[in-house]
UniProtKB/Swiss-Prot annotation:
InterPro entries: Acnase/IPM_dHydase_lsu_aba_1/3 (IPR015931), Acoase/IPM_deHydtase_lsu_aba (IPR001030), Aconitase_4Fe-4S_BS (IPR018136), Aconitase_4Fe-4S_dom (IPR036008), HAcnase/IPMdehydase_lsu_prok (IPR011826), Homoacnase/IPMdehydase_lsu (IPR006251), IPM_dehydratase_rel_enz (IPR050067). This is 3-isopropylmalate dehydratase large subunit. Heterodimer of LeuC and LeuD. Its EC number is 4.2.1.33. GO terms for biological process: L-leucine biosynthetic process. Coiled coil: none annotated. Its cofactor is [4Fe-4S] cluster. NCBIfam families: hacA_fam, IPMI_arch, PRK00402.1. Binds 1 [4Fe-4S] cluster per subunit. Belongs to the aconitase/IPM isomerase family. LeuC type 2 subfamily. It catalyses: (2R,3S)-3-isopropylmalate = (2S)-2-isopropylmalate. It is an enzyme of class 4 (lyase). It comes from Herpetosiphon aurantiacus (strain ATCC 23779 / DSM 785 / 114-95).
Length: 421
């Protein structure tokens, strides 16, 4: 019987070729990621509870200061100072400090994550490494500390849900709509402790694929792996990692992208997804473009294509927080950033921004936000009384122009709503 991507990668990491779903395996990890919010507790666990003096391999550890970057409080500044000193003391090779961006895209940009690798991180959206066809999985403090000490961890090999795409997107529709469609179809628990394989999106860049990989955790997945076809020479695929026709899947679903309409996740659950046409006229206060799910160059460019020559609607704030400095520099070099600024958007430091509700644009009670991120739970971006609608960068930009949740086509096909600079 053939193997899924999860079975192949976990088999390779465990030194076994016969791995199947349900097996228990001890695996060697290729990279451990830890970020600023959990690093202090991980460091304490590593040294005080496990008794380890040093990490097992300083070249296979990446520390990223991205969750509250720059620090918003003295306590956060002290914690980040502690992390920097620890990194220097350990001789760790890879520290990505304030302004470099979010761990998931940054580690792929740096070439630290490649197809077939096994990566564990102290963040639930570590499934994002599947954008580069790696097995990425989030873990808690103790498991990350153990991986730092030994270079190993264990998994029950997950079953796999296969999500197929056919066709291509119509104007105004993009990969975020596909990801939200999958959340709507599979539901929040539809892939609990399973791997999600994404197929049929070879035309997407790895950054666009990250939308799918990061949304995998929102259906309960242990990992979300996008088929590596089309990744390019900078992401060489090992010969042993391949699609096997006779692999066994727990479920297979298919989406015709050519008929897909814009999707919106309405408060307060990610899988509470409806067609945009069914949302009604919802006025918004804030449009927030960012996160590891949709804060990349491609997302900023998509928004800029709608905002070009237009201004934000009165009483709408638009905050753009790039996912990485690389995406920010690219947007600055080709005029994308200038277009966003001309429209009235505010640009933040690359990083997680308000995604965890701790700084850089948190919401007040009763405020309505269209967010290109991945979660819309109560209190996710600040006040529990705020309402968060998840949508694509295209929908976000169109909404910023009109002041209410809007199909991109309504702005692109009409000059009436445009206010030219």
């Amino acid at each position: 019987m053939g193997q899924t991507f999860a079975e192949q990668i976990l088999g390779h990491a465990s030194g076994r070729s016969d791995v199947q779903a349900g097996d228990m395996v001890v695996v060697n990890v290729d990279l451990v990621m830890m970020h600023d919010s959990l690093s202090p507790s991980i460091i304490e666990t590593l040294h005080n509870e496990l008794g380890a003096e040093r990490v097992w391999d300083r070249d296979k550890v990446a520390v990223v200061i991205d969750h509250v970057a720059p620090a918003a409080t003295v306590r956060q500044a002290e914690q980040q100072q502690q992390v920097r000193r620890w990194v220097a003391q350990q001789g760790i090779s890879h520290l990505f400090d304030v302004g470099r961006g979010i761990s998931h895209p940054v580690l792929i940009e740096e070439g630290l994550v490649q197809p077939g690798m096994l990566v564990v991180g102290s963040d639930s959206h570590s499934t994002g490494y599947g954008a580069a066809a790696a097995f990425g999985s989030g873990m808690g403090t103790t498991d990350i500390a153990l991986a730092l000490a030994t270079g190993q961890t264990w998994f029950r090999v997950p079953e796999t849900v296969r999500v197929n795409a056919v066709g291509n997107f119509q104007p105004g529709v993009s990969v975020k709509d596909f990801g939200l469609w999958a959340a709507r179809t599979l539901r929040a628990d539809g892939a609990t402790y399973q791997s999600v394989e994404w197929h049929g999106v070879d035309f997407l860049s790895w950054r666009e694929r990250m939308t799918l990989a990061t949304l995998s955790i929102e259906v309960g997945a242990k990992a979300g792996i996008v088929a590596p076809t089309g990744l390019g020479a900078e992401h060489p695929v090992p010969e042993w990692l391949r699609v096997e026709a006779d692999a066994s899947y727990s479920r297979v679903v298919e989406c015709d992208l050519s008929t897909l309409e814009p999707q919106v996740s309405v408060p307060h659950y990610v899988d509470n997804v409806v067609d945009l046409a069914d949302v009604g006229r919802v006025a918004v206060d804030v449009v927030y473009l960012g996160t590891c799910t949709n804060g990349h160059y491609e997302d900023m460019a998509a928004a800029a294509s709608i905002l070009k020559g237009r201004r934000l609607a009165p009483n709408v704030r638009m905050i753009v927080v790039p996912a990485s400095s690389e995406s920010l520099h690219r947007a600055a070099s080709d005029g994308t950033l200038a277009t966003l600024l001309a429209a009235g958007a505010t640009i933040g430091t690359p990083g997680c921004g308000a995604c965890i509700g701790r700084h850089m644009g948190v919401l007040a009670p009763d405020e309505v936000c269209v967010f290109t991120g991945n979660r819309n739970f109560r209190g996710r971006m600040g006040s529990p009384g705020a309402n968060i609608y998840l949508a694509s960068p295209e929908v976000a930009a169109a909404t910023a122009v009109t002041g209410y949740i809007t199909h991109p086509r309504n702005v692109l096909d009409s000059t009436e709503q445009a206010v030219f600079a």
